């Protein structure tokens, strides 16, 4: 019975797929969501390819984007809202703009 149940769970998990990705065409992580005036705003970290060889195996986050939706189906990318050169506590060129809610 235990083997059968494990096989069933494995089979069900492999068929799952996302039908409405919020963010496509870029890497993101650590999202924070807020609701203002009936609209959901999503603030994720924005991961980019590293311009510095030593950071190739690490995250590289120089800015934050914001996305919004009034129906949770259609999302609008508002682009970069802040970058590392505008934040006094971020060392320029460190690419450490992660976890927007911290």
Predicted feature residues:
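Carbohydrate-active catalytic/glycan-binding domains of CAZyme proteins
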Residues: 16-102
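Sec-dependent N-terminal signal peptides
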Residues: 3-15
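Solvent-exposed, well-ordered amphipathic alpha-helical segments
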Residues: 2-3, 77
């Amino acid at each position: 019975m235990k083997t059968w149940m494990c096989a069933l769970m494995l089979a069900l998990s492999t068929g799952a797929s996302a039908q409405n990705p919020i963010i496509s065409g870029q890497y993101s992580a650590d999202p924070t969501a807020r609701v203002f005036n009936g609209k959901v705003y999503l603030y994720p970290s924005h991961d980019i390819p590293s311009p510095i060889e030593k950071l190739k195996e690490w995250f590289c986050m120089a800015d934050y984007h914001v996305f919004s939706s009034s129906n949770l189906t259609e999302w609008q990318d508002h682009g970069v809202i802040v970058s590392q050169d505008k934040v006094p506590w971020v060392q320029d060129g460190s690419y450490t703009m992660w976890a927007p809610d911290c």
